Swiss-Prot record:
Subunit structure, interactors included: Homotetramer.
Organism in which the protein naturally occurs: Nostoc sp. (strain PCC 7120 / SAG 25.82 / UTEX 2576)
One Gene Ontology term, aspect cellular component: nucleoid
UniProt-listed GO biological process terms: DNA replication
Protein name, entry field: Single-stranded DNA-binding protein 1
Length: 119
């Protein structure tokens, strides 16, 4: 038996990059900053990949700074470096579930007393 489940909550680092394909599929990529327990630690950054309806929701409602929760799986994108010919790879979270967190005011760029760091 094998399990590949990733659950993250954090702030979006870039506005969603949406691509529409002739097949009708929709792909969205964005970055997510997830804080560590200590405020002195730098956040961990993750690349997220969303498809179809989930990608459309992200494109319509998620912006840089949005607080979101995601559940998905870890995959690796692989390619050959054009200059050196070296095989490279990078981890990507393939998102299956997207949750928009925080208040409407938080999503619209205002401040909120209900931000997770205040709990």
């Amino acid at each position: 038996m094998s399990i590949n489940i990733v659950t993250l909550v954090g702030r979006v680092g870039t506005d969603p990059d949406i691509k529409y394909f002739e097949s009708g599929s929709v792909k969205c990529r964005l970055t997510l900053a997830v804080n560590r327990r200590s405020k002195n630690d730098k956040p961990d950054w993750f690349t997220l990949e969303l498809w179809d309806k989930t990608a459309e929701v992200a494109g319509n409602y998620v912006r840089k700074g949005s607080l979101i929760g995601v559940k998905g799986s870890l995959k690796f994108d692989s390619w050959s470096d054009r200059q050196t010919g070296v095989n490279r790879s990078t981890p990507v979270i393939r998102v299956d579930q997207l949750e928009l967190l925080g208040s409407k005011q938080d999503r619209d760029g205002g401040s909120s007393d209900f931000a997770p760091e205040n709990f």
